Amino acid sequence: GPDSAFLRL
């Protein structure tokens, strides 16, 4: 979803 990049910390 839109938070995918953030979750890939």
Curated annotation (Swiss-Prot):
Location(s), subcellular: Secreted
Keywords: Amidation, Neuropeptide, Secreted
UniProt record, GO biological process: neuropeptide signaling pathway
Entry-annotated residues carrying Leucine amide: 9
Protein's UniProt keywords contain Ribonucleoprotein: no
Function: FMRFamides and FMRFamide-like peptides are neuropeptides.
Family named by the database record: Belongs to the FARP (FMRF amide related peptide) family.
Descriptive protein name: Extended FMRFamide-3
Organism (species): Namaquaphasma ookiepense (Gladiator bug)
